[in-house]
Amino acid sequence: MTLVKICGITDLDTARTAVDAGADALGFVFAPGRRRIAPDTARAIIRRLPPEVLTVGVFVDEDPETVQGIAAHCGLGALQFHGRESPEYCRGFREKVIKAFGVGNASVRELERAEEYPVWCLLLDTFSPGRPGGTGRVFDWRLIESLKFSRPVILAGGLNPGNVQAAIAAVRPYGVDVSTGVETGGLKDPAKIRSFIKLAREAL
């Protein structure tokens, strides 16, 4: 079954909606941006979630000690890095680590470096200069058809209820990650969250 991660959680109601709909993982963004959440707020939400839900902290080129402090304070189960973090950087954490890579015509060659990373999963997102993620745009899935990864792949980048089944059929990823695609007017939409998870579960 494909793992489903809903990213950009900022409130308890949205977290509960996602969990009740069957989400496997929830993402909490600690990097600058409109979905950024304060560690104390994330901690309060996470403490009310079932233990089987994987809670993922999203960071961009953050100081390792700051990451470790937030992870311990919030009780995060995994860390997702969206910046220029090195393999050595990723090796320094006890939590599961997800390393994000941007996919675009000019960046596919860089994906070969992914094998150097001692991480739990690779996350493939749409490449956008100057933006670490959350673009809401789909990349051409054919760009990664010839690539073989030894680690599980989580697919991101412009996924939504209308294309998640096609994405899973084309890429056959370990998991799918969505944020913008389940929003309306910049806010998480409960109906879209439920639809996305249902369709992802029915894929393949």
Curated annotation (Swiss-Prot):
Give yes or no: UniProt keyword Transmembrane helix: no
Q: What is its EC number?
A: 5.3.1.24
Domain of life, per UniProt, equals: Bacteria
Extract the InterPro entries matched here. Aldolase_TIM, PRAI_dom, RibuloseP-bd_barrel, TrpF_fam
UniProt pathway: Amino-acid biosynthesis; L-tryptophan biosynthesis; L-tryptophan from chorismate: step 3/5
Instruction: Quickly give the catalysed reaction.
Output: N-(5-phospho-beta-D-ribosyl)anthranilate = 1-(2-carboxyphenylamino)-1-deoxy-D-ribulose 5-phosphate
Q: Name one GO biological process term.
A: L-tryptophan biosynthetic process
Q: Which GO terms describe its molecular function?
A: phosphoribosylanthranilate isomerase activity
Record keywords = Amino-acid biosynthesis, Aromatic amino acid biosynthesis, Isomerase, Tryptophan biosynthesis
Q: Which family does it belong to?
A: Belongs to the TrpF family.
The UniProt entry, under NCBIfam families, shows: PRK01222.1-4
Q: What is this protein called?
A: N-(5'-phosphoribosyl)anthranilate isomerase
